[in-house]
Amino acid sequence: MFEKLINQIKELSTIDFKEATEKIRKYIDEISEEDFNEIVKQIGTIPENIEHDSTEEKLYSKASDIVLARCFRLLGLASRALDERADSADILAESISGYKYSLVADAKCFRLSRTAKNQKDFKVSNLSDWRGSENEYAVLVAPYFQYPQSTSQIYSKALENNVCLLSWEHISILLEKM
C-alpha cells in the first residue's frame, strides 16, 4: 500500500499543488484501516526515489501531515492537516469528548541517508511558538531512528517548551491497540 501512495505522489507532482494535496487527502482518507496502518509504519522514511527538494518531496511531506491527522482522528480527536506551509504548525487536533483541549502537531520525515541531524531539523521551539495561547499541547512525530540516542538539544528544548516527542512507531502501536 505504501508503494501505491508513492506512485500517487509521483503521478500528482505534475499538477497544481493544492489539487494534488486534495487528491492525496482523499486517497489517504479512503483506504482501509489495515492498509492505512501499513502506511503509518513507513511514512517516516522518505524513499530515495523521491527527488530531493522537489514537488514530489513537498507532496510527500504533505502526505505525512495528512497521515498524522488521520492517526489523531482514529485515536479519538477531531483533526486536520492545515494548508499553511511556512511558519505554522502542520496539524491541528481537538478533543471531542468531555475534555476540552487542543494541540498542534508537526509530522517529520527523513531519508535513511540523512545522518547529520540537529535540533533545527526538528523545530521544537517553533512548534511551541505555533501552539500559541489557544492550544494547550504541542506534539512532534518523527521516525524513532532519527531521534538522537544520547543527550541532545532536541530533548532539552522539548522539556523547556513542553513539547511531546513521539515516533511514528509509537503512533503505530497506539493504532494497533485501538
Can you name each region flagged by the protein language model?
Residues 1-59:
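Interdomain/boundary linker segments immediately adjacent to catalytic/signaling cores
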Residues 83, 109, 141-145:
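Structural motif
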Residues 93-104:
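Active-site beta-strand-loop-beta-strand hairpin of nuclease catalytic cores
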Residues 111-125, 148-150:
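Active-site-adjacent loop/helix micro-motif of nuclease/hydrolase catalytic cores
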Residues 126-131:
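Substrate-engagement module of ASCE P-loop NTPases
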Residues 132-159:
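Nucleic-acid nuclease catalytic cores
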Residues 154-178:
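Charged, structured surface patches that assemble and position nucleic-acid processing machinery
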